[in-house]
A protein has these predicted regions:
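A broadly conserved amphipathic alpha-helix scaffold signal in soluble, globular proteins
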Residues: 97, 168-175
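A short secondary-structure junction signal
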Residues: 136-139, 145-149, 184-186, 194-197
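A short acidic, glycine-rich active-site loop
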Residues: 153-167
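Metal-dependent nuclease catalytic regions and adjoining charged, substrate-binding loops involved
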Residues: 160-163, 175-228
Length: 228
């Protein structure tokens, strides 16, 4: 599936370099609305101040989650961090429209999902479903594009060095959506290149990663009960 996605996107963009291409008014309107929502998200929406575990953070090291939960003051972000976040949202919005326009079957965009275990649950918002698999869209620096997701990286490199918990995030999106997690669709935010990092068919790490994330949740809840 990942080769199909990249091939269709590359053909579409190559054709757009040579001449105008067909993009429906509905897709253009969808992109405009996504850009508007991205700007509101980064600048005008009320920020969530209370820490909560979610699919996008539960795979991080437990000590980091505990620091965030305790309210420890984080290092001040540089002023341009907000621009980086906005660029990421806009690239993701463009990626979805480009895939749709190139003939990739994109569905269930930004769908809320929930994973339940024991008497607990964790929420998240998956990016897209393509075919029968869930994919996460990432914008990446040139270094990360090459060395984490691209030719010099790949699934094994990401599995061995995953401080942001990308694997746990993706696996839980899949579990919550009751579909397999396919991997990552990645756009180099400097050059515009695309690549995919596919989860291998015989993936032995899934349950181990999910179990570690569940243990993080249990320890997080236990610490809250202790503080209360």
């Amino acid at each position: 599936m990942s080769d199909f996605i990249i091939n269709r996107v590359q053909m579409f963009l190559a054709e757009a370099n040579k001449a105008s291409v067909e993009v429906s008014d509905d897709l253009i309107e969808e992109f405009a609305n996504a850009c508007k929502d991205a700007f509101k998200k980064q600048f005008t929406e009320e920020r969530e101040t209370k820490f909560r575990y979610r699919m996008s953070n539960v795979g991080k090291p437990l000590c980091q989650l505990q620091m965030e939960q305790s309210g420890a003051e984080a290092e001040a972000m540089p002023y341009n961090a907000k621009m980086r976040n906005l660029f990421g949202d806009l690239i993701e919005a463009a990626a979805i429209i480009i895939m749709k326009a190139s003939g990739v079957e994109v569905k269930d965009i930004q769908k809320k999902v929930q994973y339940k275990f024991d008497d607990k649950y964790i929420n998240g918002t998956m990016d897209v479903k393509i075919g029968d698999k869930i994919y996460d869209i990432k914008s990446a620096s040139p270094y990360s594009f090459e060395n984490k997701f691209g030719e010099n990286g790949g699934f094994d490199a990401l599995k061995n060095d995953d401080p942001f918990g990308y694997l746990a995030q993706g696996y839980m999106y899949g579990e919550g959506a009751k579909s397999d997690f396919g991997g990552w669709i990645v756009i180099n935010k400097s050059t515009g290149e695309w690549c995919t990092t596919e989860v291998p068919p015989e993936d032995s790490s899934k349950q181990e990663v999910i179990n570690k994330a569940k243990e993080n949740i249990k320890n997080y809840i236990k610490e809250l009960e202790y503080l209360i």
